[in-house]
Amino acid sequence: MTHLNKKQRLENNHNNTVNNHFEDLHDDLIISILRKLATSASSPSDFLTVLSTCKRLNRLGLHPLVLSKAGTQTLAVTAEKWSDSSHKFLKLCVNAGNIDASYSLGMIRFYCLQNPVSGASLMAKAAIKSHAPALYSLSVIQFNGSGGSKTDKNLRAGVALCARSAYLGHVDALRELGHCLQDGYGVPRDVSEGRRLLIQANARELACSLRSYLSLKSGDENETLTDLSVVPVQEIHPVNRFLKEWFSSGRVDLAEGLRMCSHGGCGRPETRAHEFRRCSVCGKVNYCSRGCQALDWRAKHKVECTPLDLWVAAAAEIGDDGEAVAVEIDDNHGER
C-alpha cells in the first residue's frame, strides 16, 4: 500500500509540474502560437478543438489578435453545421477586424438569412480594405440590382467595382470585365481590350491549375503534363460552397419563381423573379453574371445546350404514327 501511495504521489507531482510549465508561458507567446494556428488551420474544427482544451486556451484563442488572423479555411463553416454558435464565432471575427469573416458573413446574411442591408454592409466593409472577392460580389449585386427591384441596377458602379477587383487579381472579375468591354455593358464598348482581358483571365486560370498540378505531382515521376485529366479544377470558395449546401440541402426553400445560378461553383440565388439572365439558346439555365455563364459553358453547358427552335421543330415533325422523324440542326451557335 505504501508503494502505491508513493507512485500516486510521483504521478501527481509530474502532472503538477506539466501544468506549472504551461502556466509559466506568457500570454503573448500563446497568442502568437494561436495566431499561426488560426491562419493555417484546414478547418474550423482544427482550431476550435484546441480552444476546448482548457479555459485559458479558450480565452486567449478568442482574443481579437488571434481572430483577426483566422484564415479562409478556419472560417469555412458548413451549412449543415450552421448554428447560433457558428454565427457568433463569425461575428467575433468580424469585430476583430477579419476581412475574410466580413465577406463570408456578409454573403451568408445577404443570400441565406434574408438580411441584404446587413450583408451588403459587411461586404462593403471588406471591400474598403481591398478584399477582391468582396468587391466582385458587390459588383454582381450592382449588375443585377440584387436585394431590390430591377430599377436598382447600377451598371457603372458594377463595372467600377469589377475593375477594382480585377486589378487586385480576381480571375472571375477579370473575366466579367472582359465581357462588359466586349458587349459595351455599363462601359464604352472596346472589343479588343475585352478580348485581351478574357485571354488574360484564361491564362491566369490555367497557370493556377498547372501550379496545383505540379505541386501534386512533384514527387511522381510517372506522371507527365500531358495527363490533363488530373489537372485540378478551380477551387470553390468556402462561402460559395456554403450557399450551394444551404439551398440544395432542403433546409430552406427558394420562394416561388426564384432560381439558382446554374454555374456549379457559384451558389447565388435570385432575390427576385427573373433577376438572372437566361441562356439565349436553350433558355433552360440561368446565370448571375457573364463570368459564371462563360465558365459553365466551357465546363458542361456547351455539350448540353439545345436550341429552343429544335424542340419546336421536333414537335412539328411528329408523324401521325407518333414517331419523331430526324430533324437537322445547326450546331454552330457560339457562347451566349
From Swiss-Prot:
It comes from the Eukaryota. SUPFAM superfamilies: HCP-like, HIT/MYND zinc finger-like. PANTHER family: MYND DOMAIN-CONTAINING, MYND-TYPE DOMAIN-CONTAINING PROTEIN. GO terms for molecular function: zinc ion binding. Residues 19-70 form the F-box domain. A zinc finger (MYND-type) spans 263-305. The keyword Ribonucleoprotein does not apply. It comes from Arabidopsis thaliana. This is F-box protein At5g50450. It holds the Pfam family TPR_27. Zn(2+) 1 binds at H263, C266, C288, C292. Keywords: Metal-binding, Zinc, Zinc-finger. Zn(2+) 2 binds at C279, C282, H301, C305.
